[in-house]
């Protein structure tokens, strides 16, 4: 079955369709990871996006029940050079094509993904639509140009109701802006008691749970659209230790008076080098974001930059000068990706311990 990708600049890529036969539109982005496609396509941060994978062969080890980052993928499409029809791995339970059909996600294979990636790098992120060949291309282009960027992605992927995960250790409130499952697992591995709450939870509701710390999760979209999160974080500063990841990092920055801006084509992949400014040490990190904190906006804030991207110098980590709070733009939980930054969860545990000790001695 032939299928095409139409971009808002008029570019057309014709290839073979797989997965669902739905017509879907969204922001077309690219991911440079070589493995981890199951975790990637189930990452809620990709809500509403059509994802191009730059590695040429995808699907060769199949899909299993353990590697999902959410059970209901929110991506609007998947584009690959070649989709493997016959996966081979002892953990495999179904093919990529089978999963996409079940989750109603359209796929496109057999196109020049390198050309598409170069196009996005040159012109910036573009809106696109996956559709059959018998459509009016010019009409689709005009519709894409006229379609506003959604502002409700976080509400689509955040938990509807709070829930509790018992544990003998530190009590953590995990604010779900589109949380990856492995963030919760990292807290559970450290024996934390976790309360997962929706994105619109107020600071008063958080404090009522008596947390030792608050973790602000990853999520999709423009951080400026999540005003509830900014207000909540602002009202929590100084009252409880904070740790922000990805979107949570951006919301933390906004709450402290900084600004964010959209990147030309974003950072998406499991091979992004990050430098810690104080030591010069390099970590290879998993990343998935289209926005960044503007360094010039930090001048009149109490924030300092702790980490920066090696490739383009953008901010990858922040810490508060006064309060026990820090954040990173990348994903220390990996999944998929390297575990160089996994120690940040241990740092969060130590921050909660030291803050509690300080409170007892005051």
Swiss-Prot record:
Reaction(s) the record says it catalyses: hydrogencarbonate + L-glutamine + 2 ATP + H2O = carbamoyl phosphate + L-glutamate + 2 ADP + phosphate + 2 H(+)
Keyword Protein biosynthesis: no
Pathway linked to the protein: Pyrimidine metabolism; UMP biosynthesis via de novo pathway; (S)-dihydroorotate from bicarbonate: step 1/3
Keywords: ATP-binding, Glutamine amidotransferase, Ligase, Nucleotide-binding, Pyrimidine biosynthesis
Location of the active site: 246 (nucleophile), 331, 333
GO molecular function, one term: glutaminase activity
Stretches for region CPSase: 1-168
Domain Glutamine amidotransferase type-1: 171-358
Superkingdom of origin: Bacteria
Gene Ontology terms: biological process: 'de novo' pyrimidine nucleobase biosynthetic process; 'de novo' UMP biosynthetic process; glutamine metabolic process; L-arginine biosynthetic process
Gene3D superfamilies hit by this protein: 3.40.50.880, Carbamoyl-phosphate synthase small subunit, N-terminal domain
Enzyme Commission number(s) from the entry: 6.3.5.5
Residues reported in the UniProt entry to bind L-glutamine: 45, 219, 221, 247, 250, 288, 290-291
Keyword ATP-binding: yes
Known function: Small subunit of the glutamine-dependent carbamoyl phosphate synthetase (CPSase). CPSase catalyzes the formation of carbamoyl phosphate from the ammonia moiety of glutamine, carbonate, and phosphate donated by ATP, constituting the first step of the biosynthetic pathway leading to pyrimidine nucleotides. The small subunit (glutamine amidotransferase) binds and cleaves glutamine to supply the large subunit with the substrate ammonia.
Subunit structure: Composed of two chains; the small (or glutamine) chain promotes the hydrolysis of glutamine to ammonia, which is used by the large (or ammonia) chain to synthesize carbamoyl phosphate. Tetramer of heterodimers (alpha,beta)4.
Family: Belongs to the CarA family.
NCBIfam families for this protein: CPSaseIIsmall, PRK12838.1
Protein's recorded name: Carbamoyl phosphate synthase pyrimidine-specific small chain
Organism listed in the record: Halalkalibacterium halodurans (strain ATCC BAA-125 / DSM 18197 / FERM 7344 / JCM 9153 / C-125) (Bacillus halodurans)
């Amino acid at each position: 079955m032939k299928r095409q990708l139409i971009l808002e600049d008029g570019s057309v890529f014709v290839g073979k369709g797989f997965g669902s036969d739905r017509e879907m539109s969204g922001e077309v982005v690219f991911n440079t990871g070589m493995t981890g496609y199951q975790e990637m396509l189930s990452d809620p941060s990709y809500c509403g996006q059509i994802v191009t994978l730059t590695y040429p062969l995808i699907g060769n080890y199949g899909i299993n029940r353990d590697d999902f980052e959410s059970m209901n993928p929110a991506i609007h499409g998947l584009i690959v050079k070649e989709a493997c029809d016959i996966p081979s791995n002892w953990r495999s339970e179904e093919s990529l094509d089978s999963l996409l059909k079940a989750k109603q996600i359209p796929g496109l294979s057999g196109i020049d993904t390198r050309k598409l990636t170069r196009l996005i790098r040159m012109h910036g992120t573009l809106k696109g639509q996956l559709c059959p060949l018998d459509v009016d291309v010019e009409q689709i282009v005009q519709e894409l140009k006229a379609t506003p960027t959604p502002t409700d992605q976080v509400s689509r992927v955040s938990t509807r109701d709070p829930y509790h995960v018992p544990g003998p250790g530190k009590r953590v409130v995990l604010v779900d802006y589109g949380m990856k499952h492995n963030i919760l697992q990292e807290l559970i591995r450290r024996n934390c008691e976790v309360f997962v709450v929706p994105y619109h939870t107020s600071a008063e509701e958080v404090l009522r749970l008596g947390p030792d710390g608050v973790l602000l999760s990853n999520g999709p979209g423009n951080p400026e659209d999540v005003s509830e999160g900014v207000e909540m974080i602002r009202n929590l500063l100084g009252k409880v230790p904070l740790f922000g990841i990805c979107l949570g990092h951006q919301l933390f920055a906004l709450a402290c008076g900084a600004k964010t801006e959209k990147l030309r084509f974003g950072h998406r992949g499991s091979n992004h080098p990050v430098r810690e400014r104080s030591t010069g040490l390099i970590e290879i990190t998993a990343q998935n974001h289209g926005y960044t904190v503007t360094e010039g906006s930090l001048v009149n804030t109490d924030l300092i930059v702790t980490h920066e991207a090696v490739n383009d110098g953008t901010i990858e980590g922040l810490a508060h000068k006064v309060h026990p709070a820090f954040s990173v733009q990348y994903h220390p939980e990996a999944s998929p990706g390297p575990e160089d930054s996994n120690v940040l969860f241990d740092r969060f545990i130590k921050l909660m311990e030291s803050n509690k000790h300080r409170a007892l001695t005051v």
